[in-house]
């Protein structure tokens, strides 16, 4: 399948993911392209990732992972990062999560909303986890909720009906792609900013973020003519 170029007819984007590091496995390369082009991108994290490091208690891991996420965002030109403080590892799909995300959509007023893979499986067939699935499905619904003045009245301000695109990265079957070759070093820097988390994984594959990201970006680029390195998205017109 040949991937299509990611649409460029938008000015403001909101990235909504479950955990610190979720966007950095490739998606942040696209963010670097967008901020270099002068687009406004902000991040919303549903949790602080406090349950993500087995050797560090949540009370310590939360602030540590928040700091790493802010550094990862700075590497790709993003200054505005918010956290909702839903509990890591047990994120529940439901009205509270939809309300919280819809409120930020109304306040930030994005035309593009980006989230992570919320399908049941990752590319290659590995099972996804509940936090990712619940967050992505809540993001999908919150894009609609934000535009309905009778849903969550008063949350976040006036209704916002101009979300034009929802995009998910890390998906099994992408439809669109962004050429990240010119900003690949910034994509690597954003993933490398999660030093404590990557070290705790104890995974030789993740010991070298550049090699890991390059292999995935080369695979996507095989479906995206003209690019040597690319990140894929499934695009859902709203």
Predicted regions and their residues:
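Metal-dependent de-N-acetylase/amidase catalytic core
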Residues: 1-14, 94-238
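Active-site rim/loop-helix segments in enzyme catalytic domains that contact anionic ligands
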Residues: 1-111
